[in-house]
Amino acid sequence: MIILGIETSCDETAAAVVRDGRFVLSNIIRSQVDLHQRYGGVVPELASRRHVTSIVPVLDLALEQAGIGPSAIDAIAVTEGPGLAGSLLVGINVAKTLAFVWEKPLIPVNHLEGHIYANWLTLPGQDEVPEPTFPLVCLIVSGGHTELVLMRGHGDYVLLGRTLDDAAGEAFDKAARLLGLGFPGGPAIQKAAEQGRPGRFSLPRAWLGESYDFSFSGLKTALLRVLEQYQRRPARRVAAGQPFPEYVAPEYGPSVPIADLAAEFQAAVVEVLAEKTARAAREFGATMVLLAGGVAANAALRQRLREISPVPVRYPPPILCTDNAAMIAGAAYYLAQRGVRADLDLDVHAHLPLVTRTLLRAGEA
């Protein structure tokens, strides 16, 4: 089964062709980082406008690289949520149009489920990735979400924990802004941390008792308090005659230990994520831990989980950690096996949860 996937939930315009939920025939991503860097984060209005101008060329290239035309496609898959409403709307409208004109089934996909299914994908030229065996503990870590999920089968998810405030990726973005490292924050923090010494400063870890929930807002505030000792001028936004104010980074004195603070901040985030995930894998008898989402590309998180997990750890290659359409097409294959379809009145669901049911004890599994 060949599925064309479309992903426009935030600031990447993406289209991909995937065979049988596993094999990537093409995976085209057009990033908007250059557009949003000057603002210190994603501007939703600008993101949706860029999707409008990018989506058709991206689709054309995805089909061209896959070497197929519309007649070879069995279904159209699209992200229905969660994400930015204006961005999601572009992808959904295009997907509905193609489904109507080409007379193909339309499959709606949860963006978070797509991130999980990136772990099933094999890129062109790679050895085939074996299918994971259930049950799995999945750590979904991105700019907008941090969730720990028990996956007992295709479509069978139970929520173990989630962030109570900032997502891990959001925490990295905010910390990078405080440190003057730019956007996106995750790669910037990781690069700076490579030159730093974690432990020179002591930033808090929010363990929240035996809970599998997460909290990163206190960590961000603690970093701010340390930086205030070195600050010459706070961060600010300057309109400069533009419709959206530009972000101007803070200024610090020459002695500010940016690399050490980045290393300690990263260590604090990674330690909590990894420890709770490894504990969940033990408690619920997982056969494997899956990392998913943009923060899954973080080398320190990957390494720490490999060190302490009681079971093997799998994570996608970096190109499949970021938002992409191959993961949407991959997830759609397994949805199609369960008969999931959408009508042409499919709408945006900006706050769509992956799962609402919470597992409180291992015995409930």
Curated annotation (Swiss-Prot):
Binding-site positions, substrate: 140-144, 173, 186, 298
Gene3D superfamilies (alphabetical): 3.30.420.40
Top EC class of this enzyme: transferase
Record has DNA-binding as a keyword: no
Cellular localization per UniProt: Cytoplasm
UniProt remark on cofactor binding: Binds 1 Fe(2+) ion per subunit.
GO biological process, one term: tRNA threonylcarbamoyladenosine modification
Annotated EC: 2.3.1.234
Cofactors (names): Fe(2+)
Transmembrane helix listed as a keyword: no
Disulfide bond residue pairs: none
Alphabetical keyword list: Acyltransferase, Cytoplasm, Iron, Metal-binding, Transferase, tRNA processing
A cellular component annotation (GO) from this entry: cytoplasm
Main location class: cytoplasm
Molecular function per GO: iron ion binding; N(6)-L-threonylcarbamoyladenine synthase activity
Annotated positions binding Fe cation: 111, 115, 323
Primary role: Required for the formation of a threonylcarbamoyl group on adenosine at position 37 (t(6)A37) in tRNAs that read codons beginning with adenine. Is involved in the transfer of the threonylcarbamoyl moiety of threonylcarbamoyl-AMP (TC-AMP) to the N6 group of A37, together with TsaE and TsaB. TsaD likely plays a direct catalytic role in this reaction.
UniProt name for this protein: tRNA N6-adenosine threonylcarbamoyltransferase
Protein encoded by which gene: tsaD
